[in-house]
Each structure stands twice: as C-alpha cells, then as structure tokens.
C-alpha cells in the first residue's frame, strides 16, 4: 500500500477527491466509474471499485440520494396513540426488518405518529425529504388511508397484514383466521364448550379475520355462538386481561 493511501485511511472519511488522487484520475471519471456508467471502460470501473474498497470509501447517503433520487431507506411509521399496542411484536419485528435491510445495504427510517392525520402527514414528510423510497405498513386497517395516499403518490409499500382487496398489493401475514379456528378446536378437544373470544380493534383487518376463524371453529365443533362471550377492542395485554375478567 502506498504512503498516500495510508495517509488517507487515517482520516475519518475517504472522499471522491482522495480516490481520484490515489488513482491519478479525475473526480468525474471516478464518480462515473463507481456509478457504473458505460462510457467508462470495464477495466477502469473495476480498478476504481477495488481501490475504493481498499481505502474504505463510502458514498455520502445524502449526496447519493440527490444524485440518484433514491435514499436506499425503508420507512416505518409506528402509531403511538395506543400505548403498548406495538409491544408484543415490535422488538422481533424491527430486528427482522433491519437485518434484512442491512443485508441489502439499505437502512430503516423509523418515525412515530398519533392518529391518522399525523400518520399521513408523517408519510408525506418522509417522502418529500427523501428519507424513504418505500414503506412497510403494519396493522392494516379495513379501510387503510395509508395505502390510498401512497398509491396516489406512486410510492411502493409492503403490507404487514392483509386488506379486503389485496389485488396489486405486496403483503405478508400469518393466517390468523386458521390459527383461531384451530385454537377453538383444541379447546373443544379438551372438553371445553363455553368458549370466549377476546378480539382486537375491529378497525383492523386482522381482527375481522380472527373473528371469521373463531366463528368457523365454533361451527366445525357444532357449538352455538354466545354474543356475551365475544368482545372486541383489546389492543394491549392489559386490555385483554381486563375484558377476560
């Protein structure tokens, strides 16, 4: 390794100018080589990339976003108006998302909002400020305003959950309706006949699916539904415990 390269590596950040000086090329040539422009020969592109790796060059995210129009960041806006609603799954969920994003050299931009109006305003702000190229939408609603907004702005998104009409949507979900049906049948197999059902908020699509599964399980077991044992609105463990009592 030459002296100039070692000196640069001792600095906090390697720049395009440092690379250009080390390679004896212009900054424009180095920049175009790093971005894969075809007017730069394959051998030069490879040479520049190898030197960038050796010197530890990393492009500034903000400058890269301005140049390419992409931030290489996913957006996630969490609701804070229901205390504790995210708690049962949030840590594992964030760990999975950030790990997958990092493997593709992407980052995760996380924001919070209280209520639908603030949620939509936050999504628009992250888009306008180029802080996210697309969004993950957890806890899908039966009539999800986030989807309508992002579709109108032609911004991609992935649903964590389902909607009534999933055509054209990328989504992933657990089969909550099947899990609920199996839960009912498991209780029946242990001799239980008076089975209660504590559901989440009915504004969320998963709650409707879970109720479908519960009703199907009761029907499969030949049991009648008891309206006084079917309650909804529990979005936290504490709320569920209170309704159970």
What are these regions (language model features)?
Residues 1-9, 22, 54, 96-105, ...:
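Bacterial carbohydrate/catabolite-sensing allosteric modules
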Residues 1-72:
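N-terminal helix-turn-helix DNA-binding module of bacterial transcription factors
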Residues 26, 72, 133, 193-194:
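Short acidic/polar active-site loop segments enriched in Thr and Asp
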Residues 57-122, 219:
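Amphipathic helical "hinge" segments at domain boundaries
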Residues 115-117, 138-143:
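Short beta->alpha connector loops
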Residues 119-131, 240-245:
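Short, well-structured alpha-helical segments in soluble
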Residues 132-138, 196-198:
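Periplasmic-binding protein-like
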């Amino acid at each position: 390794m030459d002296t100039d390269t070692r000196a640069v590596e001792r600095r906090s950040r390697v720049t395009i100018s440092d690379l250009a000086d080390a390679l004896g090329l212009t900054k424009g040539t180095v920049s175009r080589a790093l971005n894969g422009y075809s007017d730069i020969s394959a051998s030069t592109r490879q040479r520049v990339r190898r030197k960038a790796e050796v010197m530890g060059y990393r492009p500034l995210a903000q400058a890269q976003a301005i140049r390419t129009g992409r931030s290489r960041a996913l957006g996630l806006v969490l609701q804070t108006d229901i205390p504790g609603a995210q708690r049962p799954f949030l840590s594992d969920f964030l760990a999975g998302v950030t790990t997958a994003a990092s493997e593709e050299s992407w980052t995760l931009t996380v924001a919070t909002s209280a209520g639908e109006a603030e949620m939509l305003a936050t999504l628009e702000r992250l888009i306008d400020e180029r802080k996210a190229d697309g969004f993950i939408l957890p806890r899908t609603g039966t009539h999800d305003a986030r989807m309508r907004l992002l579709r109108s702005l032609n911004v991609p998104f992935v649903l964590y959950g389902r909607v009534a009409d999933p055509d054209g949507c990328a989504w992933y979900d657990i089969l909550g309706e099947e899990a609920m049906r199996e839960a009912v049948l498991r209780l029946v197999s242990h001799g239980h006949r008076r089975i209660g059902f504590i559901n989440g908020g009915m504004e969320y699509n998963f709650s409707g699916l879970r109720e479908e599964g519960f009703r199907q399980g009761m029907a499969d077991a030949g049991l009648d539904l008891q309206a006084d044992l079917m309650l909804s609105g529990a979005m936290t463990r504490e709320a569920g415990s209170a309704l159970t009592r």
